[in-house]
Amino acid sequence: MNKVYGEGETAVNALRDVSFSVKKGELLLIVGSSGSGKSTLLNMIGLLDRPTSGKVFLDGVDTTMLNDNELSSFRNSKLGFVFQFANLLSDLTVLENTLLPRKIQRTDKTAVDEAKKLLRTVGLEKQMNNRANKISGGQAQRAAIARGLINSPSIVLADEPTGNLDSVTAEIIVQLMKSLAKKLGQTFIIVTHDKHQFGEVDRVITIKDGRAFVGEEQRGMEVTAS
């Protein structure tokens, strides 16, 4: 997979020959310095942008063949997102925020029950009916993780999920994601600038100058969830 921005002399190669597979239940870190291409890679995996060349497969589907409407629907059903800031709607309850991605499809009693179960799993049983502006930053990020899981996605993509938290709260969020990966068999792809914060994980991919490395070895790597 390659991504080039611009043309001719102003062209910037943001990603160069990147291709890798992801196993179900794997917790994968993508690390790199600012401008390395890691955010561009996350946008490709998250189907928020299209590669200049190459393909992105998810659950056996070549997503580069989908039109914009198909891609949007596929993204909502197959991917969950967690960002540096929780981005909860302050006038909604924690439960209502968790249900937002599901509302794009349809919210029914089953969805509400699933959301409540997820909130219990992430430790927010007592806060689920609180307004989002009445909970702490760490609790908000837990709610964001539950929101990312509500559609039972193949992959949860997390972009600097601990970047706005103090060290103690960040450690709680790290352990929560690790626990969910094991307990639910949930695949996580996490972009971070600090791989040491996450300790032992299944795999670490380093992005440098748009190229992907596992350890010291450059990898020409298909993005799949199987």
Q: Which residues make up each language-model segment?
A:
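ABC family nucleotide-binding domain
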Residues: 1-200, 204-207
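Conserved beta-strand-loop-alpha-helix hinge in the C-terminal portion
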Residues: 203, 211-226
